[in-house]
Amino acid sequence: MTSKLEQLKKITTVVADTGDFDAIARVKPVDATTNPSLLLKAAAIPGYADLLNACVNDCKGDVGLASDRFGVAVGQEILKVIPGRISTEVDARLSFDTEAMLKRAHRLIELYDKAGIGRDRVLIKIASTWEGIRAAEKLEREGIQTNLTLLFSFAQAVACAEAGVFLISPFVGRIYDWYKKATGNDYQGADDPGVQSVTRIYNYYKANDYKTVVMGASFRNLNQIEQLAGCDRLTISPDLIEKLAADTGKLERKLSPGKTGEARQSLNEAQFRWASNEDAMATEKLAEGIRQFARDQEKLEALLAAKL
């Protein structure tokens, strides 16, 4: 029998959500994504010690540069075992500063370039704030493709599409977490608010012929993944990928182009901010996500600073 993983791979590009290249080599995804939290976990893996030490050389005390070098070094290793692309994230503490995000994105691309890795194999991850979307819009015009992360609302998805970003990462599990805590309900199947969010965005993009790739992210269980079978891409943790590989049940396609979606919309900054303000879940989860990534960035930098 064909596993659910193999069935999924026929209709969706499977991406590994991890910085552990041993796990990536084991599950064999097309692409991989990292973030500050995953890099912090990777830094604790004994096999990464030499990589971590090498990243602090010649940094002249610049812990931010050392951190970027580590992110790129991890990406470089991952690219040795995947055929596709690596997503590397801009420092979350810059999420409300367009120019600072642009500078950091350019530095990441420069570091990849020095390592002999072309921009066609890299996606720059940026938080889906208004400022982040504006930075991504400029990067796309420069030929640097982006992955807009921490996306929790339809307004964020609309703004990203209008900006022409290459890919968005709408979160499923964190939306589910918020609604479960707020209501006490344990949502299942198509009733899951995270699943509903990604489905709505996917249908909207396809109905309006947006080229932006929809990559569902942040999964809590296999059912959430199965409910989004057919999505352009899904970024999944290695443990859930392995569970899919062990399941030989039938996988039904849930998402496909051609279904009815909402009419094309456009949001200016004031409209975007108002829509965000009206969405308590998205406001709270975006702020929480940025704070968590920022704290993990600081922990990673403290680890690197001790080696400088």
Swiss-Prot record:
Q: How does it assemble?
A: Homodimer.
Q: Name one GO cellular component term.
A: cytosol
Q: What is its main location?
A: cytoplasm
Q: Which residues form the active site?
A: K125 (schiff-base intermediate with substrate)
- Pfam families associated with the record: TAL_FSA
Per the record, the pathway is:
Carbohydrate degradation; pentose phosphate pathway; D-glyceraldehyde 3-phosphate and beta-D-fructose 6-phosphate from D-ribose 5-phosphate and D-xylulose 5-phosphate (non-oxidative stage): step 2/3
Q: Which family does it belong to?
A: Belongs to the transaldolase family. Type 1 subfamily.
A GO BP entry is: carbohydrate metabolic process
Which GO MF terms are attached to this record? transaldolase activity
This chain's protein is named Transaldolase
Give the matching HAMAP family: Transaldolase_1
The compartments listed are: Cytoplasm
- Sorted alphabetically, which InterPro entries does this protein's record hold? Aldolase_TIM, TAL/FSA, Transaldolase_1, Transaldolase_AS
The reaction(s) annotated as catalysed by this protein in its Swiss-Prot or TrEMBL entry are:
D-sedoheptulose 7-phosphate + D-glyceraldehyde 3-phosphate = D-erythrose 4-phosphate + beta-D-fructose 6-phosphate
Encoding gene (name): tal
EC numbers: 2.2.1.2
Its biological function? Transaldolase is important for the balance of metabolites in the pentose-phosphate pathway.
Q: Which UniProt keywords apply?
A: Cytoplasm, Pentose shunt, Schiff base, Transferase
Originating species: Pseudomonas fluorescens (strain ATCC BAA-477 / NRRL B-23932 / Pf-5)
